[in-house]
Amino acid sequence: MNQLYLVPDIQDMEHSVQLAEEYGCAFEYNDFYAPAVLDDPKKQEEIIAHYKKYRSDFSKDTMHGAFLDVTIHSSDARIREVSALRIHQSMEIAKKLGLRGVVFHTGRLAGFRVDYYLTQWKEMNAAFFRELAEKYPEQQIYMENMFDEAPDVLAGLAEEMKEVKNFGVCLDYAHAALTGCTGREWVETLA
């Protein structure tokens, strides 16, 4: 992304806009990942209308997509179905706003490194996000570490998806700092 992002405070947009201008930041919206918002189109429109009062160009901005309980790699078809719905809802909001991209989380079970699970995680995420990238060519799709204990699994997905032009990884350094790996290891492995 090579861009500094600021999460705007919807209650104090004047200050958020001022900070963004002062530091050359784009916005990363964190208002649209909650199930209550995703289930309420009226609430979505209210949030969008509020942001549009303060900004007309969203082309450098991103948003956090749905991530609470989202498990696209689940062996349970019904969980995958709801997870796919939430991800598609996120992409539609991004498309409506004209955002640069959407950040999703890996959704992995922290510390669970059984081979079949990691293989399934990579294969199912690659298939799903490859298809999603084709459907939404105007938006970037980023996969961010969250409770991942090391960068290798996310790096494996990035390698698998390297030919997909609108897919990439997003390193959350604060999440990475909670692991036993150094920041350097995260950066070098994901680079």
Annotate the PLM regions:
Residues 20-22, 55, 134-136, 190-191:
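Flexible, charged surface loops at secondary-structure boundaries
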Residues 35-40, 144-151, 174-184:
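Active-site glycine- and acidic-residue-rich loops that bind
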Residues 1-3, 14-21, 92, 154-168, ...:
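Histidine-acidic metal/acid-base catalytic patches
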Residues 10-12, 31-33, 67-69, 106-110, ...:
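Active-site-proximal loop/turn and secondary-structure-junction residues that shape catalytic pockets
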Residues 1-70, 74-89:
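N-terminal pre-domain/capping segments
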Residues 3-5, 24-28, 58-62, 100-103, ...:
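Structural preference for beta-strand elements that scaffold enzyme active sites
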Residues 43-58, 124-132, 185-189:
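Catalytic-core regions built around general acid/base machinery
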Residues 73-168:
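Active-site acidic/histidine proton-transfer and metal-coordination neighborhood
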